[in-house]
A protein has these predicted regions:
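Positively charged, solvent-exposed patches that mediate nucleic-acid binding
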Residues: 1-115
Length: 115
């Protein structure tokens, strides 16, 4: 299933204002429920990260880590991932458990209870 993107500035601002937040040294995660019943992802990389090459690498790493966590996320959430300077030097395999923990704290993951 393809992830929908958050593209409008209004959507980003709404999630920043009303969403829940968890921060780590590598990534900041904002989560807010939406009425679409679908998962939407927004990525933010500021110029503090470095030049265009570093920012694009940070985005690729975040996307790859999110792809691994995606099947565990409940539908109906908007998620914004903000890259930090350490994101550029982190592999997506190291970022996946961090994202899983953050989304779990924010209540965006499906329960793993098996009957």
């Amino acid at each position: 299933m393809k992830t929908l993107s958050i593209k409008r500035n209004n959507d980003f601002l709404r999630i920043y204002r009303r969403g829940k937040t968890v921060a780590d040294s590598r990534v900041i995660c904002y989560v807010s429920p939406n009425r679409l019943g679908k998962i939407r992802l927004g990525l933010t990389t500021s110029k503090k990260i470095g030049n265009a090459v570093a920012r694009n690498r940070a985005r690729r790493v975040l996307r790859a880590a999110f792809r691994e966590v995606y099947p565990m996320i409940k539908p109906g959430f908007d998620i914004i991932l903000v890259a930090r300077t350490k994101t550029t030097f982190t592999k997506s395999t190291a970022l996946t458990p961090i994202l899983t923990a953050q989304l779990g704290k924010l209540g965006a993951l499906q329960s793993t209870k098996e009957v």
